[in-house]
Amino acid sequence: MAQQAPTMQIDNLLAQVKVLGSSLNVADRAKVQKSLLDALSHVETPYEHMLRLSGSLACIRFGADIGLFKALVESQEPLTCSYLGEKLNANANILGRILRLLASARLVKQTGLDTFTAEKITQELAAQAMESGAHLLFDIHNRTYQALPDYLCENKSKDVDNMHNGIFQKAFSTDLSCYEYLVHNPKLQGFMQDAMKLNQTEGDWLSVLPMEDEIKRWQASDPDRVLFVDIGGGMGHQCIRLRGKYSDIPGRVVLQDMPITVERIPKPMPHGIEAMPYNFEEPQPIKNAKFYYTRNVLHGLTDSASIAALKNVAAAMGTESLLVIDDLIIPDEGACTQACQLDFVMMASIAGKKRTRDQWEDKRKYNEYKCKRNSQFL
C-alpha cells in the first residue's frame, strides 16, 4: 500500500479535529488550541505569523464601528460588497479588502466573488460586549503595545510596577493612571465595562465554591448581615449570577466599585443587590460578611498595593468570614498564549501582572491568611 503524502496525512488529522472538536470540554479545548497553535508555528515563517496577526484587529474595530458584523448576521443570504457599501455608507472596494482579510482569519465566510456571509464567530463580533472588547484592545492595549518596546529599552533595569509612571503614561502622554484616565474618558470607560461581560461563564467559580456547605453554620438572622461582597465587581455580573443560582440563601449581596462605575449601573439592581462606591485603598466598610470576593482585580495592583488592599479586607473579616480570590495562576512551565497575553495587557496598561502560584502564596503569607481551599477551573 502506497504511503500517503504528508499533506494528505495532515488533512486526515485536521478532519478528525473538526469532527471531534465540538464535543470537547473546556479543559480539553484549551489543550487542543495550544497544540494547534504550536503546530501552526511549524508551517509558517515568523514574518507570515506577524502578517497574519497585524491587520485583523484594526479591521475588526472598523467593522464594529460601521455595523458590518450586524449586517452580515441579520441577513439570511450572503451579501455582496456593493450592497454592504450602500447599506453601511462605506467604499465597496475597501470593504472587499477588509472582508477578505477577515475571511482568511475565519471571522467571516466568503461564498463567492466579493460576496460574504456570517460565520459562527461573527455572531459574537456583532454583540455589544465584543464590539467594546475590540475597542478596548485597539484603542488602549494596542496603543500601549506600541510604546512597550521603547519603554522597556529606556528602563532596562527597572520592573514595571508603577501605575503612574509606566508604559501607559508613555503611550498616552499623561501623568494619570489608566483608571484615572478612563474617568475623564467615559466612552473608553464604557467600553471597558461592557467588555467585562465577556468573562467566562463555563466551569467557573460558582461550580467549585461549596457555597451551601460553607453557610451551614452561618446565621443571617440579622437582616443587615451581609452574605457576599464583590470588591471591584464592575457592573455586577457575578453578584447577579450568584443570586440567580442561590436565590433563597439569606443575607445581603453588595457590589463595590469605583464611583464612576457604580454611577453607570442601572438601578435598582436585580435580586435586591446593593451597589456601593468603594476604593481598594480605603478601609473596608462592610464588616463580618460571610464572603469577600474579588475577581480579576488584584492583577491590576502592584505587589505593594495588592498587599495593602488585602490587609484592608482582613481587617474587616470576622471569625466566619472567607476571602475568595478568583484569578488566573500562571503555571511555572508551559503557560498558554492567552495567559501570557493577559499578563502583558496588565503590564502595559496598569503596571499589573498575572501571578504565579508562588507569587500568590507570598501574598497569602504576608497578610497571614490561611488557605482553606484551592480550586482550579477553566
Swiss-Prot record:
Residues noted as binding S-adenosyl-L-methionine in the record, renumbered to the chain: 232-233, 257, 279-280, 295
Use of this protein: Diterpenoid pyrones display various biological activities and FDDP E shows anti-HIV activity. FDDP D and FDDP E show also inhibitory activity of 42-mer-amyloid beta aggregation that is involved in the pathogenesis of Alzheimer's disease.
Alphabetical GO biological process terms: methylation; secondary metabolite biosynthetic process; terpenoid biosynthetic process
Entry keyword Phosphoprotein: no
Keywords: Methyltransferase, S-adenosyl-L-methionine, Transferase
UniProt pathway: Secondary metabolite biosynthesis; terpenoid biosynthesis
InterPro entries per the UniProt record, alphabetical: COMT-like, O_MeTrfase_dom, Plant_O-MeTrfase_dimerisation, SAM-dependent_MTases_sf, WH-like_DNA-bd_sf, WH_DNA-bd_sf
Catalytic residues (UniProt): 299
Keyword Methyltransferase annotated: yes
GO molecular function, one term: protein dimerization activity
EC numbers for this chain: 2.1.1.-
Function: O-methyltransferase; part of the gene cluster that mediates the biosynthesis of diterpenoid pyrones. The first step of the pathway is the synthesis of the alpha-pyrone moiety by the polyketide synthase dpfgA via condensation of one acetyl-CoA starter unit with 3 malonyl-CoA units and 2 methylations. The alpha-pyrone is then combined with geranylgeranyl pyrophosphate (GGPP) formed by the GGPP synthase dpfgD through the action of the prenyltransferase dpfgC to yield a linear alpha-pyrone diterpenoid.
Similarity remark: Belongs to the class I-like SAM-binding methyltransferase superfamily. Cation-independent O-methyltransferase family.
Protein's UniProt name: O-methyltransferase dpfgI
Organism: Gibberella zeae (strain ATCC MYA-4620 / CBS 123657 / FGSC 9075 / NRRL 31084 / PH-1)
